[in-house]
Amino acid sequence: MKQVQTKRDWKKLAYDVVEEKMITKEDAIAILEADDTEVLEIMNAAYIIRHHYFGKKVKLNMIINTKSGLCPEDCGYCSQSIISEAPIDKYAWLTQEKIVEGAHEAIRRKAGTYCIVASGRRPTDKEVNHVIGAVKEIRETTDLKICCCLGFLNEDQAGRLAEAGVHRYNHNLNTHANNYESICSTHTYDDRVDTVQKAKQAGISPCSGAIFGMGETIEERAEIAFELQRIDADSIPCNFLVAVKGTPLEGQKELTPVECLKVLAMMRFVNPTKEIRISGGREINLRSVQPIGLFAANSIFVGDYLTTAGQEPTADWGMIEDLGFEIEECAL
């Protein structure tokens, strides 16, 4: 007689997490390896944790790409890298006025956090000053929380951004340490961890996540979540690879919608109190199951991404309302 495999009690695991019992790496791998028919049970369990810590609130974030392309790094997934042949817009820094205008557009889109992003390995001191000028005006004229993503930072730059009023700094780990050399050769995994730590030491809330679907194993996928727990990232963007034509990862098989849901649920189980954001690839990879993702995640980007299009803000507002959730405005 064929032995029937007993399914996991996902709800019990969720209640254990709510009672502050940490799950194991084996538990995380079990979520990722669960049969696709269990995904709704897993998402229901993830929602127990999500609701316990965040209720029905959804945080909206908006990106402005203040400097596009022209990056000397060779990250294989990125359309802005020096080795990319993707047909993207390339431009130097936007003016401070344009950056400030973007902040007011973020408010119109009901975003609470405004993310100032620039391509490149690391900013010069002059470029940091350029951002600081815009940040100060935004702080004086809005209640927005400000996140910056400018590349590697030194201690002085991190301190000056903190003093200017930057609330959060994004620097993703991107992939597992074991997989990093296959993705990028111009800097190391440890370089990325170092910048996250410098931002945190300066008093800036650390935002760090990963891009899933870049050849990492299931075990590595789970270990990424625990590494983000270790570095104590307050906000965790879960990106799903969009295999952009003209990049080295063109043709890479993208994750299925169900695989993406399992990643989001696993990340919620491992990092129960953290902001989990469905980020790049949301519309392309999750497709029609986007709303289900919010049963694990509590944050999304509204509008376009760096070089790929998002959906209309009204579609995101409607999705949140249809779920019975609420937009948390002006919240970090």
From Swiss-Prot:
Record keywords, A-Z: 2Fe-2S, 4Fe-4S, Biotin biosynthesis, Iron, Iron-sulfur, Metal-binding, S-adenosyl-L-methionine, Transferase
Domain of life: Bacteria
Free-text remark on how the cofactor is bound: Binds 1 [4Fe-4S] cluster. The cluster is coordinated with 3 cysteines and an exchangeable S-adenosyl-L-methionine.
Subunit composition and interactions: Homodimer.
Annotated ranges, domain Radical SAM core: 53-282
Pfam families: BATS, Radical_SAM
Cofactor(s) of this protein: [4Fe-4S] cluster; [2Fe-2S] cluster
Entry GO MF terms: 2 iron, 2 sulfur cluster binding; 4 iron, 4 sulfur cluster binding; biotin synthase activity; iron ion binding
SMART domains linked to this entry: BATS, Elp3
Amino-acid positions noted as binding [4Fe-4S] cluster in the UniProt annotation, renumbered to this chain: 71, 75, 78
GO terms, biological process: biotin biosynthetic process
Function: Catalyzes the conversion of dethiobiotin (DTB) to biotin by the insertion of a sulfur atom into dethiobiotin via a radical-based mechanism.
Family per record: Belongs to the radical SAM superfamily. Biotin synthase family.
Name used for this protein in its record: Biotin synthase
Positions annotated to bind [2Fe-2S] cluster: 115, 147, 207, 277
Database matches in NCBIfam families: bioB (TIGR00433)
Pathways involved: Cofactor biosynthesis; biotin biosynthesis; biotin from 7,8-diaminononanoate: step 2/2
Matching InterPro entries: Aldolase_TIM (IPR013785), BATS_dom (IPR010722), Biotin_synth/BioAB (IPR002684), Biotin_synthase (IPR024177), Elp3/MiaA/NifB-like_rSAM (IPR006638), rSAM (IPR007197)
E.C. numbers: 2.8.1.6
Organism phylogeny: Bacteria, Bacillati, Bacillota, Bacilli, Bacillales
Reactions performed catalytically: (4R,5S)-dethiobiotin + (sulfur carrier)-SH + 2 reduced [2Fe-2S]-[ferredoxin] + 2 S-adenosyl-L-methionine = (sulfur carrier)-H + biotin + 2 5'-deoxyadenosine + 2 L-methionine + 2 oxidized [2Fe-2S]-[ferredoxin]
